[in-house]
Regions:
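Short, positively charged, Gly/Tyr-enriched micro-motifs
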Residues: 1-5, 11-14, 21-28, 65-154, ...
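Acidic/histidine-rich catalytic cores and adjacent linkers
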Residues: 2-4, 35-38, 42-43, 107, ...
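Metal-dependent DNA phosphodiester-chemistry modules and their immediately adjacent helices/loops
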Residues: 84, 257-291
Length: 396
């Protein structure tokens, strides 16, 4: 008797298994959302009890891309209480990291075969080589939208600016391109990434264009701009934000003095400079600065003395603001930490094919950082500034 041979269609089976897994993932995630809602409201659906916080108001659908495929989340709508699900938040962080990784792969010259393997691991399907470049273009779109978003944090009293130099391969020749970066502390005391733009070089025209772009997106209420003494920046601040004052970063100022100081005397000079900015008033800081200049001259450090004498006043602007804010507004450290992270990420690329590629990778990183605890943790108590403004001690 002949035996029946059963032929299995491997592709059909794989498709059915994938759909089974996708369905299971979708069901599990929706159960987790319901559990989150129950925990927040302290009650199950339709349950009435004295501990209940808020009420159900149906659901809304939200698509989520997972390694098992696209799933539809039924997100509970609540009345009387806000519902920020941890699942969506984790997705946002993952989405930002995927965009950044995709751009990095493209810029770093990863082989097409390797990119195919990675995209299959991320999205569950292998893309063709012709599609890879399109994926990178698509990754640029949300980053560019974020970069040009309206600034809605109200007023931004403190603004920090800096420039990052990255290497660009322009027609076979390597040259540096400046990416101008700005962050701020808003009127509620939270840090916010304002934006980044290609500046070609740090000059007056680039800074004016950058500041006007920020102002056009909603940057307002600027009282102080903190940054290094870059070429043309001080003049640009005066033109675009005439009511704002300028604070030269004390750390950059120190390094400028160290550049003309013998290595054997740097530690001593650093101690002398820090003593100036440890004073409790602008008057005493000026007096201390005069003493430091005299001491430097007695040490035969005439060039260092000249730099201190010429530049010290620009480093004392912070004294016009609440003393509670001094340590955080006299340096550019808050933006320098971000820049170090950006440099760590861009170092693996080496040289960029164009300025826009460099800008997109920088913005991808800034966008990621902005969505973390960095931007959600209060940085300053702005009531001190409000009180000072009411006393008209900073007006003008």
């Amino acid at each position: 008797m002949s035996e029946k041979i059963v032929q299995l269609n491997e592709e059909v089976i794989k498709g059915q298994l994938k759909e089974l897994v996708r369905g299971s993932v979708e069901e599990t995630l929706n159960e987790l959302l319901e559990a989150e809602a129950e925990k927040l409201t302290q009650a199950a659906r339709y349950e009435r009890n004295e501990q209940r916080q808020g009420y159900r108001s149906g659901h809304y659908n939200r698509n989520l891309t997972t390694t098992s495929g696209d799933v539809t989340l039924k997100v509970p709508k609540l009345k009387g209480i806000s519902f920020e699900t941890a699942i969506i938040e984790r997705y946002r962080r993952r989405e930002s990291s995927v965009e950044e990784a995709l751009i990095e792969m493209y810029l770093a010259g990863v082989s097409v075969r390797r990119v195919e393997d990675i995209t299959e691991a991320l999205w569950g399907s292998k893309v063709s080589p012709a599609t890879i470049s399109e994926l990178n273009k698509k990754a640029y779109v949300p980053i560019e939208d974020w970069r040009n978003r309206p600034l809605q944090g109200g007023r931004y009293p403190y603004v920090y600016v800096d420039g990052i130099y990255l290497c660009r391969n322009w027609g076979g020749e390597f040259e540096n391109v400046a990416i101008l970066v700005a962050i701020a502390v808003n009127e509620d005391g939270y840090r916010e990434v304002l934006g980044a733009a290609e500046g070609m070089k740090e000059d007056k025209a680039s800074w004016i264009s950058f500041f006007q772009w920020l102002r056009g997106r909603g940057l307002d209420g600027v009282k102080l701009v903190v940054g290094d003494k870059c070429l043309g920046m001080l003049e640009a601040v005066g033109e675009v934000f005439p009511e704002a004052k300028y604070q030269r970063c004390t750390v950059h100022f120190y390094h400028n003095v160290f550049s003309v100081t013998p290595r054997s005397k740097v530690k001593l000079v650093a101690k002398m400079l820090k003593a100036i900015h440890a004073q409790e008033s602008k008057k005493s800081a000026r007096e201390k600065a005069r003493a430091v200049v005299a001491q430097l001259r007695s040490m035969k450090l005439k060039e260092a003395a000249r730099k201190v004498e010429d530049g010290i006043e620009e480093t004392l602007t912070y004294c016009d603001f609440p003393s509670e804010h001094w340590t955080r507004i006299r340096t550019n450290n808050v933006i320098e930490r971000l820049n170090r992270e950006i440099r760590r990420r861009t170092r693996v690329v080496g040289s960029f094919p164009d300025g826009n590629s460099a800008l997109m990778l920088v913005c991808a990183r800034l966008r990621h950082v902005a969505g973390t605890q960095w931007g959600n943790k209060k940085y300053m108590n702005m009531k001190h500034l409000e009180a000072a403004l009411e006393d008209a001690s900073i007006a003008g």
